[in-house]
């Protein structure tokens, strides 16, 4: 996916060796993505031990998978009747980004899809399906890198 979206993700465009163009929209998007990562980073660091100790159970995971599956069906049916207020990725504001980031916090609960939670959140606040999916993809890159780095640091690079 990163290879496929590289031109859209990379904020620089090289015309030749001497001249490069900075894509301001891409820089702006990455700043919004960084803002959207803040809520889940804070909550993940604060509650990681609790989530692992008390919610990492088959029953919680099963309940959450069923709950979000049903919720996704309900939101999709409800959303068919609405016209999105944010149509394009470039139209996503910092406020919308932080709200989508708040929905990403739900993915800390085992059994919750990170992309599902952020897409549902984006649809609820009026983002189009396409923009919601694209923003969720961009949001995955720093989120997964950060979560992986956190776990590696926490466990001292010990692999089992």
Listing of model-derived features with the role each one plays in the protein:
Residues 1-160:
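Multi-pass membrane proteins that catalyze or facilitate reactions on polyprenyl-/lipid-phosphate substrates
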């Amino acid at each position: 996916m990163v290879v496929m979206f590289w031109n859209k993700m990379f904020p620089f465009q090289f015309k030749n060796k001497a001249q490069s163009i900075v894509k301001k929209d891409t820089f702006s998007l990455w700043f919004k993505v960084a803002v959207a990562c803040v809520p889940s980073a804070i909550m993940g660091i604060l509650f990681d031990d609790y989530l692992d100790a008390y919610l990492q159970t088959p029953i919680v995971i099963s309940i959450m998978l069923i709950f979000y599956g049903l919720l996704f069906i309900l939101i999709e049916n409800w959303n068919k009747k609405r016209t999105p207020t944010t149509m394009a990725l470039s139209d996503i504001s910092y406020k919308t980004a932080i709200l989508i980031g708040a929905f990403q916090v739900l993915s800390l609960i085992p059994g919750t899809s990170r992309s599902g939670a952020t897409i549902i959140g984006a649809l609820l606040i009026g983002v189009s399906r396409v923009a919601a999916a694209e923003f969720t993809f961009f949001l995955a890159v720093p989120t997964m890198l950060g979560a992986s780095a956190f776990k590696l640091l926490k466990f001292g690079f010990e692999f089992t």
